[in-house]
Amino acid sequence: VIGNLVCAVSENPGAGAAYARQLPRADCRFLERYTRSFNYPEQSSVKSLADIDKYGIKTYFCSNVCAAYDKGIYLKTGGFTERAIFNEDMICAGTMIQKGYSVVYAADARVYHSHNYSGKQQFHRNFDLGVSQAEHPEIFEGVPSEGEGIRLVKRSLGYLIRTGHFWLIPQLIWQSGMKYAGYFLGKRYRKLPRKVVLACTMSPYYWNRK
């Protein structure tokens, strides 16, 4: 895994980072397995600023679950931001891309990593995701995320129908609704009372440090 990530960075001039493909663990739920394959396909890719129209918000995607960075580019672009409730890896990758570097998705570097989040957990997680985007407009402004989320829902629905897992459709609707509700509120956290923010967040310690 490490060798493939290092090769992905070293063999692609201007690559500031490379991240691995995440495979579902044995206990991973059916719907989450599809989400893994949607977010981490079999084909590798190299993403740069020229790919914004093609990939949208996914151009900036990078996951610290398993990733390697070019030290020189990492330091030159400022490394990880000091304050981020979530998405520090994506903020770092987005900064690199905006400064003319690229990020590699190395599908041949594989790790097992997945979650079986409940709807409530998805709400909290996506609230923090929305907060991170609201706090870093220099990265996310003008690159909407909603379209990618809608595409995932549509693809997931089609997959459930094709495979005959109709009874999971209500779960898809519930989980997707909770994701969007959390994200919607997180993007607008500045308008919310502190008590509401603390009830919505997955990371109360972050707000206690603000």
Feature names for model-found ranges:
Residues 1-33:
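Conserved donor NDP-sugar-binding/catalytic core segment of glycosyltransferases
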Residues 20-26, 37-59:
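Short, flexible, basic/aromatic active-site loop/helix in glycosyltransferases
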Residues 33-39, 121-124:
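Short, hinge-like loop/turn segments at secondary-structure boundaries
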Residues 48-72, 84-85, 91, 133, ...:
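A recurrent flexible, glycine/aromatic-enriched loop bordering the glycosyltransferase active site
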Residues 66-69, 73-78, 83-110:
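A short, conserved alpha-helix in the catalytic core of glycosyltransferases
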Residues 103, 109-180:
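Active-site-adjacent helix/loop segment of glycosyltransferases
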Residues 148, 152-155, 178, 182-210:
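Juxtamembrane C-terminal module of membrane proteins
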